[in-house]
Amino acid sequence: LNYWIIGDGTNIILKNNLKGLVIKNNLKGISFYQNSMMAGAGELWDDIVTSSLDNNLYGLENLSGIPGSVGASPIQNIGAYGSEISDFVEYVETFNLKKGRYEVFSKSACNFSYRDSIFKKKPNLLITKICLNLSEKFKANTHYEALPKKVLDAREQRKNILSIRSQKLPNHKKIPNVGSFFKNPIISESKLKKLISDFPEIKSYSFDEKKYKVSAAWLIDKLDLK
């Protein structure tokens, strides 16, 4: 029997009807211990962002408004506006569908990278719960250029993030869409310098000590593909 396990289904477009069993991961539950937050895979991602703020734990503000479920978040290593979920993951709990047992992955074992993780390569693992390590003190992440550099508190930061998102993407509850699925190309410094010489207005960001991200949105606009 073929089966598909889905989260909230916000990134799914079906070409044809599925033949088999469709299972919605609806594992719920949010709990806290000191600065750790545990959330069931069936919770909505944005609900745990607001729940963290309600419990005076900080760090997830820049990930506000991302559609989808908690269980999907580490698979893609979701990120936005200078933050990624991998910045906060303590561990990911999974159920191995082939071996019939629970398996827990530490942050390092998740093999997180830019919009990637070990879970993309292991479809037999059903994510059941995640544990996030958050901060008891708010420190605004304002690396994204459009964000105000001075922020009063975490709720203002969240408000700013939601405002930016609303300008870039339609509300998926009113106009269904799969959001932004383009990855920013990662290139070497030498390639970036060549691009800057040809296109001085190009938008780029530091990725690590040797590589840079080029804005996919800028490239799409430049090629009139929007």
Locations of the language-model features?
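Anion-binding (especially nucleotide phosphate/pyrophosphate-binding) glycine-rich loop
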Residues: 1-92, 96-98
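Phosphate/pyrophosphate- and phosphate-bearing ligand-binding catalytic cores of soluble enzymes
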Residues: 102-226
